[in-house]
Design a protein with these regions (language model features):
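Soluble acyl-CoA-dependent acyltransferase catalytic core bearing the H(X)4D motif
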Residues: 16-194
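M16 family metallopeptidases and their MPP-like homologs
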Residues: 1-6, 11-20
Length: 194
């Protein structure tokens, strides 16, 4: 994937979206309820459980595999802005969170629940790697997670994200075999100067 191969130690290829939530008169709005809601909404989307598996010796691009240690708790985080909880504090925290590289040992996404905003407001920072889906796909997922009604009916998950599969995690031997099978194409591209 182009977005993986062009990533550097100082230039990451993830995207992010920041949404400010107004709890209004709600007395039971909390991190735990939001985490449960998000878990329910993304559970049918297999890409959120995939991680990259590097090929030995870097002979081929990484492959998507199911993360056998997947747990939503490793992806949804809780943090607070410092007082007074104004927009400056929020943007500084969001910039800091955005500037950190996603952990490649797990699926390449994070969701940050940000507390401490003035006026009984919260923020949600969605961060995912561009190789997972393009910006429009990320926006559609964000829209499926956020509603403007107090008790909305569930929004449908975009159909292009349902039913996808990695085909199972390849073994070391399968990775070597796949890499050897791709070597003639790689050599032709290298020889052609691609």
């Amino acid at each position: 994937n182009l977005f993986i191969s062009t990533e550097t130690d100082t230039g990451y290829q993830h995207t992010a979206g920041l949404v400010i939530l107004d709890a209004g008169e709600s007395r039971d709005f909390c991190f735990e309820k939001l985490a449960a809601f998000v878990a329910e909404r993304i559970s049918p989307i297999p890409q959120f459980r995939w991680k990259l598996r590097e090929v030995p010796f870097g002979l081929d691009l990484p492959y998507w595999v199911e993360d056998d240690k997947y747990s939503i708790e490793r992806h949804i985080h809780r943090i607070a802005v410092p007082a007074p909880g104004d927009m400056r504090a929020l943007t500084e925290l969001a910039a800091y969170l955005y500037s950190r590289r996603l952990d490649r040992s797990k699926p390449l996404w994070e969701l940050w629940f940000i507390e401490g905003l003035a006026g009984k407001r919260y923020a949600l920072l969605q961060k995912l790697h561009h190789c997972m889906m393009d910006g429009q796909g990320a926006q559609r997922i964000g829209e499926a997670l956020c509603d403007f009604e107090a008790d909305p009916p569930p929004r449908p998950i975009p159909p292009e994200f349902l039913g996808a599969t990695t085909g199972g995690a390849p073994s070391e031997l399968q990775l070597y075999a796949r890499t050897v099978g791709n070597l003639p194409d790689l050599m032709r591209e290298t020889d052609a100067g691609v």
